[in-house]
Amino acid sequence: MLRQATKAPIQKYLQRTQLLRRSTPRIYTIVQCKRSICSFNARPRVANKLLSDIKTNALNEVAISTCALKSSYGLPNFKRTYVQMRMDPNQQPEKPALEQFGTNLTKLARDGKLDPVIGRDEEIARAIQILSRRTKNNPCLIGRAGVGKTALIDGLAQRIVAGEVPDSLKDKDLVALDLGSLIAGAKYRGEFEERLKKVLEEIDKANGKVIVFIDEVHMLLGLGKTDGSMDASNILKPKLARGLRCISATTLDEFKIIEKDPALSRRFQPILLNEPSVSDTISILRGLKERYEVHHGVRITDTALVSAAVLSNRYITDRFLPDKAIDLVDEACAVLRLQHESKPDEIQKLDRAIMKIQIELESLKKETDPVSVERREALEKDLEMKNDELNRLTKIWDAERAEIESIKNAKANLEQARIELEKCQREGDYTKASELRYSRIPDLEKKVALSEKSKDGDKVNLLHDSVTSDDISKVVAKMTGIPTETVMKGDKDRLLYMENSLKERVVGQDEAIAAISDAVRLQRAGLTSEKRPIASFMFLGPTGTGKTELTKALAEFLFDDESNVIRFDMSEFQEKHTVSRLIGAPPGYVLSESGGQLTEAVRRKPYAVVLFDEFEKAHPDVSKLLLQVLDEGKLTDSLGHHVDFRNTIIVMTSNIGQDILLNDTKLGDDGKIDTATKNKVIEAMKRSYPPEFINRIDDILVFNRLSKKVLRSIVDIRIAEIQDRLAEKRMKIDLTDEAKDWLTDKGYDQLYGARPLNRLIHRQILNSMATFLLKGQIRNGETVRVVVKDTKLVVLPNHEEGEVVEEEAEK
């Protein structure tokens, strides 16, 4: 009776608690559980008896609530068995913090999983000196992204494994700490700090055997910072000052973040890593060559490595060596590898031809007429021949793929044997080392050499297995849009006769066309200066003589699209405050984060024609801004980006000296300007711009005035343009010679050049054509005739207006 009387109140209380749990938020549930546990503490014997009778699922819920209460209210634990019941019996023991949140680089070096590191001997020696200090033994690697900061750490790990370090660093473990995984999944306040302290405790227990590497060390500032807690940097500061060996890495810009905390920055000893030279990069690529050959199953020629270093340094300007050169080699190898995994072009062509024949045979199967039967027999013979050829090429392709795979496996085995040799030498297993050095490795080297020699024989090769300089050039061209490939025969002919292509659009300006053509040929031949733009020109002359049109024609020749000109109308930059729009507004101003119009356009199109139209209308500060562009081929925008102009053609047009050309020139039949007048125009320009600006322009070209003979050629060009527009309607336009002469006479204006002719054609021909098209007097597929009647230019209709109305009524 006493037992039931004692048990009943507690059961009622638990039932009420369950009801409250279902109807109230979680916080009230925790409070009710707390009260229940307090009542258990008041009567321990009754509580123990009650708990022994509760089912397993109830025990589990109490255990969970107990764990939550312990963390929130500091209550003592129940029996450990209750908590353990919730645990998975198959759960693995927790990993050590260093293994969980870090990567052991020395272990990777022992297994041969790190790439070889070439050079950087001085920087590695400096890092070893700092690590050997008693306090503040924390080197900080500072350098641009891609110069090899992380690779230097890999090199240090390899030296530790090889024993090429002082005794104080031998047998040490170099562990790369992952700050991302350290903070990922930290749900409760203080959990991140607890993880970090566990890592530091394990490092302390190692008694100096562990060296920590932290990449992107600027992330320590503010990492894990919440209300009332410390960030990671404040937790690490005491350890860094008392002997914790920590190597860090960051960029020049991000090191400024660390410098804002003097207490943290003084604990690191900076080591500056400069970008390696082109020759050093070539040495690095030669050291990595074998790893990439084994991975991709291809061969890499030495000329490809040299081209990767040279071309990346020349054309990829927003990144740094050796990273960008390694990327070129890697991508070129990947392209070749994908070609190996897909069918060659010859086999694909045969597949398509066989499919076409099979479809045609299927359609002729039921035909019995002699012509169809004869055609079917011819197709069957052709199909048999093509199938035989396909089988032959497929066998060759399969054999070549197997041969390439065999070479790849042999190289992989050779590399693994060399790794085992180094391991045996470190461990003192000289018997196995002798077997590897004098037996297995020479056999594998001989096998690789014989396989490559047989692959280079005179037999037919469907697969190209060597990465050459041409492959590197193609990758550069795809990445940057700059044509760096070897000039093909068709392109050679096109470049040699470039003047003829430009003269199809611009006539009467032979000197300017020749100067631009020479500049483009120099660039494609690889003979331009590496420190300046391809060319810079100032086009002078009266309005309407073809200055802007020649620039558009150049863009069409280079890019097959005249809209590929980066054009700036300098009338928009007349005021001083508008000049900043070219490179971006200063910090604090509107649109200061969007960059400049000029710099952003060239960053996205590094190979382009940049046109500054009507340059004399711009503010004088614009010419000062272009001094560095014309001389050094680069410009820095408001965001600090260094924009490369070395692959651009700079063209400035101006009407300076127009009055001299109109008044002082004796115009001949060809419209050419004499030397004395040209000198006067150039002198007028020199008075308008400072000498340092004039001296940086490659060539000042004075455009000839348009004579009537030249204007007659322009009439033909404009009529051809109209014909191109009418091609969609299957229409043609036909002008008599008399009509063309009429346009030449009426459209000629010594002051305004060719623009009056354009307006005349628009007014006299296009307006009438538009009216007749709408009325149906000229229809699609017909020829538009233009003649001269009674000294007037007339477009002749092909149908009467009334006839069109009747047809429309019938419809």
From Swiss-Prot:
Q: Which residues bind ATP 1?
A: 143-150
Segments of this protein annotated with the region NBD2: 467-658
Listed Gene3D superfamilies = 1.10.8.60, P-loop containing nucleotide triphosphate hydrolases (3.40.50.300)
GO MF annotations, alphabetized: ATP binding; ATP hydrolysis activity; misfolded protein binding
Tell whether Nucleotidyltransferase is among the UniProt keywords: no
Pfam families in the record? AAA, AAA_2, AAA_lid_9, ClpB_D2-small
Provide the induction entry: By heat stress. Expressed at a higher level in respiring cells than in fermenting cells (at protein level).
Task: Answer whether the UniProt record assigns the keyword Chaperone to this protein.
Answer: yes
Q: Where does ATP 2 bind?
A: 541-548
Transit peptide as recorded in UniProt: 1-44
One biological process term from GO is:
protein refolding
Q: Which InterPro entries match?
A: AAA+_ATPase, ATPase_AAA_core, Clp_ATPase_C, ClpA/B, ClpA/B_CS1, ClpA/B_CS2, ClpA/ClpB_AAA_lid, ClpA_ClpB
Return the domain comment text from this UniProt entry: Has 2 AAA ATPase type nucleotide-binding domains (NBDs) per monomer. NBD1 is primarily responsible for ATP hydrolysis. NBD2 is crucial for oligomerization.
Please give the family membership noted in the entry. Belongs to the ClpA/ClpB family.
The record's PANTHER family line, in alphabetical order, gives: ATP-DEPENDENT CLP PROTEASE (PTHR11638), HEAT SHOCK PROTEIN 78, MITOCHONDRIAL (PTHR11638:SF176)
> How does it associate, per the subunit comment?
Homohexamer, forming a ring with a central pore. The hexamer is stabilized by high protein concentrations and by ADP or ATP. Oligomerization influences ATP hydrolysis activity.
Miscellaneous comment as given in the Swiss-Prot or TrEMBL entry: Present with 2990 molecules/cell in log phase SD medium.
Described by its record, this protein's role is as follows: Required, in concert with mitochondrial Hsp70 (SSC1), for the dissociation, resolubilization and refolding of aggregates of damaged proteins in the mitochondrial matrix after heat stress. May extract proteins from aggregates by unfolding and threading them in an ATP-dependent process through the axial channel of the protein hexamer, after which they can be refolded by the Hsp70 chaperone system. Required for resumption of mitochondrial respiratory function, DNA synthesis and morphology after heat stress.
Question: Which protein, by its recorded name, is this?
Answer: Heat shock protein 78, mitochondrial
Organism of provenance: Saccharomyces cerevisiae (strain ATCC 204508 / S288c) (Baker's yeast)
